[in-house]
Amino acid sequence: MEINHDYRVKLFDELGFERKQCTECNQWFWTLDKDRTTCGDSPCDEYSFIGNPITSKKYTYNEMVKEFTNFFDEKGHTPVKRSPVVAKRWRDDILLTIASIAVFQPWVTSGLVKPVKNPLVIAQPCIRLNDIDNVGRTGRHLTCFTMGAHHAFNSKDDYKYWTDKTVEYCFELMQRLGIDGKTITFIESWWEGGGNAGPCYEVITHGVELATLVFMQYKKIGNDYEEIPLKIVDTGYGIERFAWASQGTPTVYESLFSEIIEKLKEDAGIPEVDEKIMAESATLAGLMDIENVGDLRVLRQKVAEKIGMDVDELDKLISPLEYIYAIADHTRCLSFMFGDGIVPSNVKEGYLARLVLRKTLRYMEKIGISMSIKDIISMQLENMKEIYPELSAMKEYIMDVLDAEEKKYIQTVNRGRGIVERMAASKSEITLDDLIELYDSNGLPPEIVKDVVDDLNKKGKKTIAITVPDNFYTIVAERHEEEKPEEVVSTKKELPELEVSKTELLFFKHPTQVEFEAKVLKIVEKYVVLDKTLFYAEGGGQKYDIGQLNDIEVMDVQKKNGIVFHKVSDISKFKEGDTVKGAVNWDNRLKLMRNHTATHVINAAATRVLGKHVWQTGSNVDTEKGRLDITHYERISREQVKEIERIANEIVLSKMPVNSTFMDRNDAEQKYGFTIYQGGVVPGDTLRIIEIEGTDVEACGGTHCSNTSECGYIKVLKTERIQDGVERLEYSTGMGSVSEIASLEDTLIDSAEILGIPNDQLPKTVKRFFEEWKEQKKTIEELQKKVGELVKYELADKFENVGNYEVLVEQVSGTPNELMSIADNLAVGNKLIVLMNENDYLLCKRGENVELSMKDLIRNIGKGGGKDNLAQGKYSENKEQITEKIIQILNK
């Protein structure tokens, strides 16, 4: 469709704004200044607020949040609480909250759910890591920023306001702050994002963009646009930029973190830098519209020229201060990440949090800050507690996770040298892909990799090329920032699309009913589709019900698009239009109900024991056992497992009612928060809420007990670390727990009988046997070492000279460990050892001066694998044939 948007609004006519075209960039803009020829934005105009505040008073960040919110509150906008910076809490397409409108996507913006208030105002903290390498260097970039926004959701039945009022509000707010109206320009622009589009104004003053006013009204389909029924006012005001412009500091960082910056400078012993230098750098950065690291190098050169200083001297002077700016920004970002419950890991939002944390730790090391990162983040929490008290409430978790992560980082750095050396041994260049692999797989920052390679180049025989891009962290963050849907491999045949009404789910109204009558709507292969059913279809981690339809076995139950498919053992017994009698297997259903309710109980107990950061990442509810996956930053200890189990059974014995209600989505979120989505994001404007009184509330479509006592005894069977940052708890309920406890008791009694001791002596006896075994193992290892030394002398005369190497190929009687001990004694200098035993075991080991890869060698003379200096496997040819092959390889 053709779009011709008129950017003229009522305010422009009333106040005499003129529409002009910028002589520098050719963009159209509106201004009160009749003499203006440029649009006002950088790089067409430079920053003119540095050292020259543009408001009638200076505002701190906290004051600006209040000023913005109060203004729109007065204008009839209801203030709403911020959402977490973890967008994954309510949507499954992005990991972090990147804009205020993200809070209302996809449910409100699609029209499926009404907004919680309309119109509304919000000050939403956001995180974007696509410019993380620019933070500290340009004077304006932040990883964490607050988007002040007023939103109006206009429909035919509920129209609020559109372009006229939006522009009027913006201009009035800026004038109330004391900004000269003649300095304000409204640039005509166009916005697209998330499949939507619309015209917008970029609101500029003194060279800096302070707000964007978007009028979301189109859906983008390919290269075309289609009008959407909901017309959305989507504004974004840069709260930090308003505070910066009101203070006129050299960079945005001084306006936000002045106290922290001063303490970090003092701690690191960094000399004062002339404010004019930093102001010049920030001003030129604005003029250059920094987008990449190449621009940053040019920026440094331009600043040096402007102030008459050598570029290397300038770099030495301001780089430490730029690191401090980045540390101040990153620690605020981490305060929100961890305060909103992110658990560091090697995937998804946990990966991004760890990236920011390790980059911060590296910068702290680089400039010699002795203050701990916990101290810095404690200052951030203190500064923000007036506006964000909920972050301070998470301080204990934040401090614990920082401790755990700092230890992991130190361990990573300590083992990093060996990892890099092994990679470098077979390479002439460490590429960007290598650096990313070392970071993703081993957590090694690229700066450490470069330090190791530089050392190797000084000592080694060859030169290994390496270049660390200045935007390395931006590159890896962008690879991980978007949520990628997990690939689900299903062994089940895809269910067909059917044009029949959705199946009525009777078990919601009648959870204990087991028999019903229904009409057959469709027969599809082995599936029967009914108009209503008591059978629960597999979903939400819970297994399907089993039972009978007209005495024919129901083997599987699945659901697609609200239609339930019943797989039966004999489809020939059913016809479309028939009325059938169904019966759910109650014993099977009861086991599923117990285990599903227990899942909620254990999740609540784990949260009490481990902390509010605990978040369910998956579950599996079967008849025999249940499984719950939760986020946690370290292994769950035995004592913690016992406490989780104790609390869970306390809840069971308390006979807490389990209530099921259907609620409006907004009402549920407002009442209970986003923790209702522990089991995953649930679509629709109405949610089924399962509330265990005083214990747990979740949006859930599963079958549950009527009170917790019906679960019976809950037994946590085991825990395991299924991935970094995720713990799995496996448990049983009721008679399943009785069986598990009986099995454990049998194991205990059988073990005691084998050892011929009373049950209560088992731990003590096993400990004694274990200590004795360790001593015997140590003795055996010492004997093996001595045998190896003796065999060394026996084999010393059996080496043959082949080219530049001394080669030994020998069949030796012994275990793999014994052969390894022999090879360790012999493999020095230019010696190459190949040993075989009577069980077809093959071992290849080289001395430090042998360049041939043992991994490659073993593949040519047998089967196996390993590393360049050591390989193990199997052989099938005799000693003479293997020797001949080795000679041929070495003589090539």
Curated annotation (Swiss-Prot):
Pfam families recorded: tRNA-synt_2c, tRNA_SAD
Molecular function as annotated in GO: alanine-tRNA ligase activity; aminoacyl-tRNA deacylase activity; ATP binding; tRNA binding; zinc ion binding
Record-level GO BP terms: alanyl-tRNA aminoacylation
GO cellular component, one term: cytoplasm
UniProt xrefs under InterPro entries: aa-tRNA-synth_II/BPL/LPL, Ala-tRNA-lgiase_IIc, Ala-tRNA-ligase_IIc_anticod-bd, Ala-tRNA-synth_IIc_core, Ala-tRNA-synth_IIc_N, Ala-tRNA_lgiase_arc, Ala-tRNA_ligase, Thr/Ala-tRNA-synth_IIc_edit
Subcellular location per the Swiss-Prot or TrEMBL entry: Cytoplasm
Annotated residues for binding of Zn(2+): 596, 600, 700, 704
Class of enzymatic activity (EC top level): ligase
EC numbers on record: 6.1.1.7
Cofactor or coenzyme needed: Zn(2+)
Cofactor binding annotation: Binds 1 zinc ion per subunit.
Gene3D superfamilies linked: 2.40.30.130, 3.10.310.40, 3.30.54.20, 6.10.250.550, Bira Bifunctional Protein, Domain 2, Threonyl-trna Synthetase, Chain A, domain 2
Keyword annotations from UniProtKB, A to Z: Aminoacyl-tRNA synthetase, ATP-binding, Cytoplasm, Ligase, Metal-binding, Nucleotide-binding, Protein biosynthesis, RNA-binding, tRNA-binding, Zinc
Domain notes per entry: Consists of three domains; the N-terminal catalytic domain, the editing domain and the C-terminal C-Ala domain. The editing domain removes incorrectly charged amino acids, while the C-Ala domain, along with tRNA(Ala), serves as a bridge to cooperatively bring together the editing and aminoacylation centers thus stimulating deacylation of misacylated tRNAs.
Family to which the UniProt record says this protein belongs: Belongs to the class-II aminoacyl-tRNA synthetase family.
HAMAP family: Ala_tRNA_synth_A
Cited function: Catalyzes the attachment of alanine to tRNA(Ala) in a two-step reaction: alanine is first activated by ATP to form Ala-AMP and then transferred to the acceptor end of tRNA(Ala). Also edits incorrectly charged Ser-tRNA(Ala) and Gly-tRNA(Ala) via its editing domain.
Protein name, UniProt field: Alanine--tRNA ligase
